C-alpha cells in the first residue's frame, strides 16, 4: 500500500487496471504504467557508490531523474530488451511495444499528426571540464551541467570553468568552441522555420570563443552576427576567434572575412589577420596572430572530428507497425544506446525508436500514444485531467485512488 518500501531486486508488475508512482531516495520518480513489468536490479545511494540499474521488461514508464542521474548520467540506467537509457536532469517516457500493441493504441487516439518540434538547435560534440547552460528566458533557474551530446536551445547562456571547454555543432553546420573560463549566449537562432527568416545571433559575454559559420548568413550576411561589449561582428563566410577581456576585444580571422562595427565605424579584416579594439568608441589596432590573448587549449572547431555528424539532427518518419522501444523526452538530456552500441542523443521534444535488432533512429515527431499519454509524469504528480481522460476506470483498488485523488506512492530504499 501507500508508503510501502521497495528494495533492490524487487520486481513490480502492474495489471491492466493499475499504475503506480515510485519515489526513490535520490529523488528519482517513476510512474509505472498498466500492463508493465519493472525491476529494481541495482540501487545504491551511498556516497562513492551511487548507482542505479533499472529494467523495463514490458509496458511503459514515465520518469523524472534524481540526484544519481543528474550528477553522473553513466551511473543511472534503464534497460529494455533492446535499449539502454541514460538521462540527465530529464523528464521522459519509455514504452516497450510488442507486436501491433502500440499501433492499435495509437489508432484509438485523436486523429491528426503531432507537429514536429524544433527546440534543439545544437549539440555538444566535444567537452572537457565543467561547462553549464541556463535558459536566457529565466536566468534565475538552476543551470544544467553539459555532457557529450547535450542538447542546446535558442536563448541558452553557456559558461565554462577555468579548465573547461565545449565544441558545439549547430543545425546549419556552424560550429562554436567555447574556451576556458568564458561565457556566451545564443541570443536567437532559427533555421527552416515556416514563415521566418533564418537567423543566428550570439553574444560573447566574457572570455573567448572560436567560430566556424554554417549555412546561415551565406545568402544574407545580416542573418548572422556576434555581439560583444565593444563591437558587433558580422561575417562573410568565416572562421575566427574572439576574446573579450577587461582591456577590450581581440579578434583573429583564420578563414574568410569579418566586419567589426562600433561607434568608430566598420572595419573589415580577412584571414590571416588579428586586431584589438579597446572600447566601443575606438578603432581596431593590429596585433600579432600569436598574441597571448589567443592562447588556449580549446581546439579550432573546424579541426574537431565529429563521428556521424549527419546523424546529429537527422530524423525519420514514424512507423508503428513494428515492435521495439520508444523514448520521448519532455525536458532535459537523454542518451539512448541500442544493442548495436551506437548512441543517440535526445533533447526536449525529441523522440526515438529502437527496433528489435537494437538500431535506434530519431523520429520526426513522437507517436500519439506517447504524446497523449493520460498517465502522469511523476514530477507532476496526480492530475485531475487523469479522471477527465477516463483513467479512473482503468485503476484497480489494489492501487487505490483516495477521494482526494492521490496516487499510491513508495519511498524506495536501498
Model-identified regions with their sequence ranges:
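C-terminal interaction modules
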Residues: 1-3, 7-8, 15-33, 45-53, ...
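Hydrophobic lipid-interacting interfaces of membrane-associated proteins
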Residues: 61-63, 209-214, 258-259, 334-337
